[in-house]
A protein has these predicted regions:
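Thiol/disulfide oxidoreductase modules built on the thioredoxin-like
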Residues: 69-73, 80-127
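Extracytoplasmic and endomembrane cell-envelope/extracellular-matrix remodeling and assembly machinery
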Residues: 1, 5, 60, 119-121
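Hydrophobic beta-strand anchors of alpha/beta hydrolase catalytic cores
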Residues: 20-21, 52, 100
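Active-site acidic short loop of glycosyltransferases
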Residues: 15-16, 47, 95
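Conserved redox-active cysteine motifs that mediate thiol-disulfide chemistry
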Residues: 23-40
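Thiol-based oxidoreductase modules, predominantly thioredoxin-like and allied folds used
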Residues: 48-63, 73-84
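A short beta-strand-turn-helix
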Residues: 1-19
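Hydrophobic, well-ordered secondary-structure elements that form the walls
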Residues: 21, 64, 77, 107
Length: 128
């Protein structure tokens, strides 16, 4: 669900766009630093067919919401409460806080855990 408890289908949110799927957690410092580094890239390319969707691994929605607000994430964030969908295991992220996946308009993975600079280089080529 999103932070308001609404059910959201991830594939509908990223359909036809180059997207960064950001699996993160409030307690994962490296995840949050990585996400914050993506804010300028998101702002530059969001009107050109790029989006980011965060999925927080939390015990409560409030914890994720507070962290996203504190860090200033301008994109849609969803929450997986108590590993209900086993997302981290499905994407081989295991017990860690998170990981990122850059996918193209058809959902093909372009990069796993790319830096902001790598994402920008890829977007420069794809979204001219």
């Amino acid at each position: 669900p999103d932070f308001e408890g609404n059910s959201v289908t991830l594939s509908e949110q990223i359909k036809g766009k180059v997207a960064l799927i950001d699996l993160w957690a409030s307690w994962c410092g490296p995840c949050r630093r990585s996400a914050k580094s993506m804010i300028p890239v998101y702002e530059k390319y969001k009107s050109k067919g790029f989006t980011i969707v965060g999925v927080a691994r939390e015990k409560t929605v409030q914890t994720a919401k507070a962290a996203a607000l504190q860090d200033g994430y301008p994109w849609l964030n969803l929450v997986e409460l108590n590993d209900a969908g086993n997302i981290w295991f499905k994407y081989c992220v295991g017990n860690s806080g998170g990981g990122t996946f850059l996918v193209d308009q058809e959902g093909k993975i372009l990069a796993i855990c790319p830096t902001a600079e790598e994402v920008e280089r890829i977007l420069e080529k794809m979204l001219k």
